[in-house]
Amino acid sequence: MRVYTIGEVLIDFIAKEEGPLNKVTTFEKYPGGAPTNVMVNLSRLGVPSGLISKVGNDPFGKFLLEKLKEENVDVSYVTLDNVHHTGIVFVQLIGASPEFILYRDVAYNYIERKDIDLKVLDDVMLLHFGSVILVQEPSRSTVLYFVEEAKRRGIPISFDVNIRKDLWRENIDEMWKNVEKGLSLADVVKLSEEERNEILEYLGLPKDDFPVLLDEYNIKLLAITRGGKGCKLLLREKSTLKAVGIAPYVVKPVDTTGAGDAFMAAIIAGLYAFDKLNTIDELDIDELEMIGYLQIW
């Protein structure tokens, strides 16, 4: 059994010097894509993991498959696309917060139902996905169909809100529709403090009313990243709300690329370690706090 993700896999071209991309001369390539990063981190934490996606039948696609195999991430369900190229993103470093230029109409945007063998669900102990893969058809419909089928079979679901308004362009209403769909399917949700505030504003609720999100979408575990303030975890057990806030170790940030993905992986790894993937709402406060400390280690 493995934790699987269905979502984007791409090449991160990360600038080797600070400054705008039109001035940068050197980049280094790494495997990327938020859900893919989560699976790599899980594998490094000793949790069996796998990826369901699509890459181009090109050198970059082959590079990704090779690197993921080296990380012991199962790629048996990654298909090759002979029409669309492997996804790429350019990452520019300006201060501690990176900025991204992501290209659309790439292989992972064209995952179709025929690309996925539903037999993989027999080997899934948790299914993870995020909102970026929902930007474009046919991947949107394919992913939602697959997640809904996993949910129907009782497989726990985790969702990374990961709001990227630039990818949705003029379709912001469509973005919110799909973010809400992801929230409604998920048992575990990860979002940033900024994303939490945006969702509450969209719902017409005050910023301090965020526990209502657990009831609004029937979420079992809500994990909120708070940057330099650490993280907050909220768990609903029947009528009882359990919450822990974890302060961070104080460090000087150099590059925050992938930090949220490492956070997401640590949450899943904590649930796996406590054998609570299928009984998330039975976490006690000590276990919840331990999972919180995993995030900032």
Task: Label each residue range with its predicted role.
Residues 3, 148, 203-297:
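Conserved phosphate-binding/catalytic region of the ribokinase-like
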Residues 9, 132, 161, 262:
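Active-site metal-binding loops of divalent metal-dependent hydrolases
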Residues 42, 192, 260:
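Short, conserved phosphate/pyrophosphate- and ester-handling motifs at nucleotide-, phospho-/glycolipid
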